[in-house]
Amino acid sequence: MVKFAVVVFPGTNCDFETERAIRKAGAEAERVWYKTSLKDFDGVVLPGGFSYADYLRAGAIAARQEIIEEVKEFARDGKPVLGICNGFQVLTEAGLLPGALRPNKVPRFICRWVHLRVADTETPFTQFYEPGEVIRMPIAHAEGNYYADDPSKVRIAFQYSDEEGNITEEANPNGSLLNIAAIANENGNVLGTMPHPERASDRFLGSEDGLKLFRSMVEWARK
């Protein structure tokens, strides 16, 4: 059975539910302290939270820890690397994904459910979705305003939308460029998402739309 590492930095707070979602998707998962080696794992997830209390910038200090060099090796080897919320911020700070995540257009913490339109189903994380499918996941961030100098080089996975899938300014909770909610690297094996799929992985939580992401990731890692 494939096994995923859920990396825990000081300030990480979404590791338990992320571990549970991966297990529910059919893989082994283990919470790994950031000073631990990743050599025995098939994929890695950087979960949400406030690593190092978001000092300097969200994700900036975590991105400079030694374990990130191993994460970069995973990415180079084509293994799945997923960053959720703060994990997405870490991936951009580490240069594993293009662009940056800036403070929300309205400068406050936003915590609510959003609708997303699936823009790319050709990544290891989105292969179980339908093109243009509208899904629901929660967001919880103060710095989720995605920006890139050259949007044409950004591989968009999810976009904020209304419940019909229309990409509108009103549906954009944070001012993110092109309503971007999640992006992948050029090869597709690194994904960063501001919405929390682990919080949408159980019908009792209001949605199982995020579970598809984990099942897609697990199925791809088995190949």
UniProtKB/Swiss-Prot annotation:
<dbReference type="GO" id="GO:0004359">
    <property type="term" value="F:glutaminase activity"/>
</dbReference>
<dbReference type="Pfam" id="PF13507">
    <property type="entry name" value="GATase_5"/>
</dbReference>
<feature type="domain" description="Glutamine amidotransferase type-1">
    <location>
        <begin position="4"/>
        <end position="223"/>
    </location>
</feature>
<feature type="active site">
    <location>
        <position position="198"/>
    </location>
</feature>
<dbReference type="GO" id="GO:0005524">
    <property type="term" value="F:ATP binding"/>
</dbReference>
<keyword id="KW-0378">Hydrolase</keyword>
<keyword id="KW-0067">ATP-binding</keyword>
<keyword id="KW-0658">Purine biosynthesis</keyword>
<dbReference type="GO" id="GO:0005737">
    <property type="term" value="C:cytoplasm"/>
</dbReference>
<keyword id="KW-0436">Ligase</keyword>
<dbReference type="GO" id="GO:0004642">
    <property type="term" value="F:phosphoribosylformylglycinamidine synthase activity"/>
</dbReference>
<dbReference type="InterPro" id="IPR029062">
    <property type="entry name" value="Class_I_gatase-like"/>
</dbReference>
<keyword id="KW-0963">Cytoplasm</keyword>
<comment type="pathway">
    <text>Purine metabolism; IMP biosynthesis via de novo pathway; 5-amino-1-(5-phospho-D-ribosyl)imidazole from N(2)-formyl-N(1)-(5-phospho-D-ribosyl)glycinamide: step 1/2.</text>
</comment>
<comment type="function">
    <text>Part of the phosphoribosylformylglycinamidine synthase complex involved in the purines biosynthetic pathway. Catalyzes the ATP-dependent conversion of formylglycinamide ribonucleotide (FGAR) and glutamine to yield formylglycinamidine ribonucleotide (FGAM) and glutamate. The FGAM synthase complex is composed of three subunits. PurQ produces an ammonia molecule by converting glutamine to glutamate. PurL transfers the ammonia molecule to FGAR to form FGAM in an ATP-dependent manner.</text>
</comment>
<dbReference type="GO" id="GO:0006189">
    <property type="term" value="P:'de novo' IMP biosynthetic process"/>
</dbReference>
<protein>
    <recommendedName>
        <fullName>Phosphoribosylformylglycinamidine synthase subunit PurQ</fullName>
        <ecNumber>6.3.5.3</ecNumber>
        <ecNumber>3.5.1.2</ecNumber>
    </recommendedName>
</protein>
<feature type="active site" description="Nucleophile">
    <location>
        <position position="85"/>
    </location>
</feature>
<keyword id="KW-0315">Glutamine amidotransferase</keyword>
<comment type="subunit">
    <text>Part of the FGAM synthase complex composed of 1 PurL, 1 PurQ and 2 PurS subunits.</text>
</comment>
<keyword id="KW-0547">Nucleotide-binding</keyword>
<feature type="active site">
    <location>
        <position position="196"/>
    </location>
</feature>
<dbReference type="InterPro" id="IPR010075">
    <property type="entry name" value="PRibForGlyAmidine_synth_PurQ"/>
</dbReference>
